């Protein structure tokens, strides 16, 4: 039996609640399949498209005097509940369909960051919708948002993405796992909070990379494997070129060389690779599997996906 953290990519969860629900239903079957094989799993997820849409919608309402504007921390909490609810319901239904009595809980999770993290001066986390170049330039002019080209898929707004330091609800997560509860935690990388005087916390405008928080969570609970599910089936070098090559098996040293060669795009694949390296360096006996949401079953059989070891 293995203990596994499964990190679902926000981009892989679709562009609407309806599309996301259908994708989540299929994912639930694969995740429950892991449980029936005796594995203990903890689920995390991204929220880039979702938190961007929530923030955009609420700010649009505020601009038209239809309600207050909401900070990113609160938008992150909303996205945790929205995505977590659909995952939780789909997993409960799938477990019920096979006669398995297991509680599923979505835990609103805060993650401490450093308010002096240089990321606050260098926004890099893509969120929200994809735009063409002209649309992005127009929005940037009107609202002052920063946009970058995102892995050949269009232009997206970017926000600060500080490094996760600690998971505030870690002991609660451990207690739930110990009591045989299927936990959905650290959604969207966690709600970013900074430590104040007397050990209080306060939310801050940012979106933490979910893979980096998932790696931290995996190391903290000493899991055997981190599975990062994204929109592509392998990690590639020379991505989106005629010479692109899938990496089927690789190791930390090789990945560090590829990082030096700028093989991985900032804001998309690079944080996943950095998370994988961090997880393995903190947990040398562990491994990382990176593949697409649709190929999870095949990846678990070793037919597809990138496997990373020390």
Swiss-Prot record:
Enzyme Commission (EC) number: 2.7.2.2
Pathway membership, UniProt: Metabolic intermediate metabolism; carbamoyl phosphate degradation; CO(2) and NH(3) from carbamoyl phosphate: step 1/1
One cellular component (GO) term of this entry: cytosol
Keyword Metal-binding: no
InterPro entries: AceGlu_kinase-like_sf (IPR036393), Asp/Glu/Uridylate_kinase (IPR001048), Carb_kinase (IPR003964)
Main location as per UniProt: cytoplasm
Gene3D superfamilies registered for this protein in UniProt: Acetylglutamate kinase-like (3.40.1160.10)
Localisation: Cytoplasm
Molecular functions (GO terms): ATP binding; carbamate kinase activity
GO biological process terms on file: arginine deiminase pathway
This protein's name: Carbamate kinase 1
Organism from which the protein derives: Staphylococcus aureus (strain NCTC 8325 / PS 47)
């Amino acid at each position: 039996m293995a203990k596994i953290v499964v990190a679902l990519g926000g981009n892989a969860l679709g562009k609407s609640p309806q599309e996301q629900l259908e994708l989540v239903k299929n994912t639930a079957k694969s995740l429950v399949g892991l449980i029936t094989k005796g594995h203990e799993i903890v689920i995390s997820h991204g929220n880039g498209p979702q938190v961007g849409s929530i923030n955009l919608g609420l700010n649009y309402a505020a601009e038209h005097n239809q309600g207050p504007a909401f900070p990113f921390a609160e938008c992150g909490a909303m996205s945790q509940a929205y995505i977590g609810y659909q995952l939780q319901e789909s997993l409960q239904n799938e477990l019920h369909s096979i006669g398995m009595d297991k509680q599923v809980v979505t835990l609103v999770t805060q993650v401490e960051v450093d308010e002096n993290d240089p990321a606050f001066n260098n926004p890099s986390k893509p969120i929200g919708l994809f735009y063409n170049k002209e649309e992005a330039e127009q929005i940037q002019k009107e609202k002052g948002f920063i946009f970058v080209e995102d892995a050949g898929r269009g232009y997206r707004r970017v926000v600060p993405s500080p490094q996760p330091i600690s998971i505030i609800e870690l002991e609660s997560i451990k207690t739930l796992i110990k009591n045989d509860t299927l936990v959905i935690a650290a959604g969207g990388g966690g709600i970013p909070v900074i430590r104040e005087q007397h050990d209080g916390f306060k939310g801050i405008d940012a979106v933490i990379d979910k893979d980096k928080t998932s790696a931290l969570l995996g190391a903290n609970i000493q899991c055997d494997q981190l599975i990062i599910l994204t929109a592509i089936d392998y990690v590639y070098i020379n991505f989106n070129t005629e010479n692109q090559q899938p990496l089927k098996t690789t190791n930390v040293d090789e990945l560090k060389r590829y990082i030096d060669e700028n093989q991985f795009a900032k804001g998309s694949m690079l944080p996943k690779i950095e998370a994988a390296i961090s997880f393995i360096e903190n947990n040398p006996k562990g491994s990382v599997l990176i593949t697409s949401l649709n190929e999870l079953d095949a990846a678990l059989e070793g037919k597809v996906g990138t496997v990373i070891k020390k």
